[in-house]
UniProtKB/Swiss-Prot annotation:
Entry's Gene Ontology molecular function annotations: flavin adenine dinucleotide binding; tRNA (uracil(54)-C5)-methyltransferase activity, 5,10-methylenetetrahydrofolate-dependent
Summary of the function given for this chain in its UniProt record: Catalyzes the folate-dependent formation of 5-methyl-uridine at position 54 (M-5-U54) in all tRNAs.
Catalytic activity: uridine(54) in tRNA + (6R)-5,10-methylene-5,6,7,8-tetrahydrofolate + NADH + H(+) = 5-methyluridine(54) in tRNA + (6S)-5,6,7,8-tetrahydrofolate + NAD(+); uridine(54) in tRNA + (6R)-5,10-methylene-5,6,7,8-tetrahydrofolate + NADPH + H(+) = 5-methyluridine(54) in tRNA + (6S)-5,6,7,8-tetrahydrofolate + NADP(+)
Protein name (Swiss-Prot/TrEMBL): Methylenetetrahydrofolate--tRNA-(uracil-5-)-methyltransferase TrmFO
HAMAP family: TrmFO
Organism encoding this protein: Rhodospirillum rubrum (strain ATCC 11170 / ATH 1.1.1 / DSM 467 / LMG 4362 / NCIMB 8255 / S1)
A Gene Ontology BP annotation from the UniProt entry: tRNA methylation
Keyword Ligase: no
Chief place of localization: cytoplasm
Length: 482
């Protein structure tokens, strides 16, 4: 029997635990290293694995109309430890999947500790494993220790490891009103269609600034210690520095002409820049913010053209440690400069507990397939939530503006147009219909992926209890939140 090298995993959060589980399912020996309790963080309370720090919610569990719910379902079918333990320790939360934090962490810690192929070690890792140390996955999370962060920065380049994320909201392009917005680059540079522009009159601008100043903000957590710096001020802080600061900053109208009113320059313009290769998502340039999420949606929908905006992601500024993954990682999460290393979890630039665990699941499978020489093992299709998230962080996102991203339907390829009824003109599904059709396609394609020959195919569940809905007759276009 071939003796394979063990897989070393650094970090006992959701991503590291999921990666370890997937590798052990494939029959590999795993060494899982967690620095707590020998070295703690400002945020963690205990020494259990997979400790949920900020919330006990894994968000919506609706697999047909919500992208994170779809990701839940895909992970369940792929034998996810995190989703199995979340189900076992579920607490009432309406349509969300929320868990008893302590029971959840204890159960995952116990499952890994009792697995005969998994060895849990406690201690800080202050350097990246060398080639001779064997294959490794770095899943050290947003609170990576200073020593390991320095080692990662040295290996990737100082500018490639961010310690704070400045997140601007991202809007689904198909929810923008182009009767009011238009495509144009400032001074018509580039191809002239690099930005979407939303104009504001003086009165609209004043009302917008008033709303920003009055909007309810989220405070930094004490342990974040995040300073503001001038290159990344929240939009509401800029407004506090003077009512015209935004009109001379990120909302300046110079070099732009409203084609519907070419003789009158808008008082201000909000620009949105393409955020993914598919062209389905656009980020609001310079709109990083600490406004509460409900306030963001309300206030930003005051902007002409964004009255019915659907947000793939809302903004924020908080402490984080993440790579410029589109530049640094290959499609199987390997560090291009050191391919014996993979990265997983929030450090790759995915945002959220579920997304972190999902990337851990994929990293564990990719590393295992490579160790076992399963060359035919392919990444999940881009039409799935797993594949869409993976594709975004490993190349689909713009490396120049990369910021952490939640899973959302905008990461999946657009649907094809089809007739509402026989003989009718084809159209692309919108709103809830788009989400349902995207989920249906994802689950069908996921089933095909899970059935490919692999170390996991005997235990995966390509066909789960949830029925895969058939394509529905297209009714009137409708909207829904992610």
């Amino acid at each position: 029997m071939t003796q394979h090298p063990p897989l070393t995993i650094v970090g006992g959060g959701l991503a590291g635990c999921e990666a370890a589980w997937q590798a052990a399912r494939a029959g590999l020996r795993v060494i899982l290293i967690e620095m707590r309790p020998l070295r703690t963080t400002e945020a963690h309370l205990g020494d259990g694995l997979a400790e949920l720090v900020c919330s006990n919610s894994l968000r919506s569990d609706d697999p047909l109309y919500n992208a994170v719910g779809l990701l839940h379902e895909e992970m369940r079918r792929a034998g996810s430890l995190i989703l199995a333990m979340a189900e076992a320790h579920r607490v009432p939360a309406g349509g969300a999947l929320a868990v008893d934090r302590q029971g959840f962490s204890d159960a995952i810690t116990r499952a890994l500790a009792e697995h005969p192929l998994i060895e849990i070690r406690r201690g800080e890792v202050d350097r990246l494993p060398a080639v001779e140390d064997g294959p490794a996955i770095i899943a050290s999370g947003p609170l990576t220790s200073a020593a390991l962060a320095a080692a990662i920065a040295e290996a990737t380049g100082e500018t490639s490891l961010a310690f704070f994320d400045a997140i601007a909201p991202i809007v689904h392009k198909d929810s923008i009103d182009f009767d009011r917005a238009w495509f144009q680059s400032r001074y018509d540079k580039g191809d002239g269609r690099d930005y979407i522009n939303c104009p504001l009159t003086r009165d609209q601008y004043d009302a917008f600034v008033d709303a920003l100043l009055a909007g309810e903000k989220t405070m930094f957590k004490e342990w974040e210690g995040t300073p503001y710096f001038d290159g990344c001020l929240p939009i509401e802080v800029m407004a506090e520095r003077g009512r015209e600061t935004l009109a001379f900053g990120p909302m300046k109208p110079v070099g732009l002409t409203d084609p519907r009113n070419p003789g009158l320059r808008p008082h201000a313009v909000v620009q949105l820049r393409q955020d993914n290769a598919l062209g389905t998502l656009y980020n609001m340039v310079g709109f990083q913010t600490k406004l509460k999420h409900g306030e963001q949606a309300r206030i930003f929908r005051m902007i002409p053209g964004l009255e019915n905006a659907e947000f793939a992601r809302l903004g924020g500024i908080h402490r984080n440690t993440f790579l410029n993954s589109p530049r640094l990682l290959d499609p199987t999460l390997r560090l291009k400069a050191r391919p014996h290393l993979r990265f997983a979890g929030q450090i790759t630039g995915c945002e959220g507990y579920v997304e972190s665990a999902a990337i851990g699941l994929l990293a564990g499978r990719f590393a295992s397939a490579e160790i076992l020489d399963a060359a035919s093992f392919a990444p999940p299709p881009p039409t799935t939530a797993l594949g869409g998230l993976l594709g975004h962080i490993t190349g689909g996102a713009n490396a120049e503006t990369f910021q952490p991203m939640n899973v959302n339907f905008g990461l999946l390829p657009p649907l094809e147009a089809r007739p509402v009824r026989p003989g009718a003109k084809p159209r692309v599904p919108k709103g809830r219909e788009r989400k349902l059709e995207s989920a249906r396609r994802a689950l069908v394609d996921l089933g095909d992926w899970l059935r490919q020959p692999s170390p996991w195919s005997a235990e995966d569940s390509p066909r789960a209890a949830l029925p895969i809905p058939e394509p529905t007759p297209l009714g009137p276009a409708s909207g829904s939140s992610e």
